[in-house]
Amino acid sequence: MARIAGINIPDQKHTVIALTAIYGIGKTRAKAICAVTGIAEDVKIRELSEEQIEKLREEVGKFTVEGDLRREVTLSIKRLLDLGCYRGLRHRRSLPVRGQRTKTNARTRKGPRKPIKK
């Protein structure tokens, strides 16, 4: 198994799909990384040479991924909470942040229904 950005990349998958195992790299960014490094998208990870894997490591290292990205997201949400702005209040109350309706729907964000006690 190849190890990129502290993550074991699955050997049996194509390069583009395998790169998406890294938090912060989706299909579009994975395709861009393959294009820059000159590695074909349909080649499986186990078929890559050590130099090609090293190229992938260098290219992925240019982006904020994994723990750093998770920390960045957490800190930005914490900053909103500390500011006390509208978005921060929505995060604090576990409600949708981006203006979705809450009279109906929003069950994922609000959690299971709480019965009314009589």
From Swiss-Prot:
GO terms for molecular function: rRNA binding; structural constituent of ribosome; tRNA binding. Gene3D superfamilies: 1.10.8.50, 30s ribosomal protein s13, domain 2. The keyword Ribosomal protein applies. One of its GO terms (biological process) is translation. It holds the Pfam family Ribosomal_S13. It comes from the Bacteria. InterPro entries: Rbsml_uS13_C, Ribosomal_uS13, Ribosomal_uS13-like_H2TH, Ribosomal_uS13_bac-type, Ribosomal_uS13_CS. Keywords: Ribonucleoprotein, Ribosomal protein, RNA-binding, rRNA-binding, tRNA-binding. One of its GO terms (cellular component) is small ribosomal subunit. Residues 94-118 are annotated as: Disordered. Belongs to the universal ribosomal protein uS13 family. NCBIfam families: uS13_bact. Located at the top of the head of the 30S subunit, it contacts several helices of the 16S rRNA. In the 70S ribosome it contacts the 23S rRNA (bridge B1a) and protein L5 of the 50S subunit (bridge B1b), connecting the 2 subunits; these bridges are implicated in subunit movement. Contacts the tRNAs in the A and P-sites. Part of the 30S ribosomal subunit. Forms a loose heterodimer with protein S19. Forms two bridges to the 50S subunit in the 70S ribosome. This is Small ribosomal subunit protein uS13. It comes from Actinobacillus pleuropneumoniae serotype 5b (strain L20). The lineage of its organism: Bacteria, Pseudomonadati, Pseudomonadota, Gammaproteobacteria, Pasteurellales.
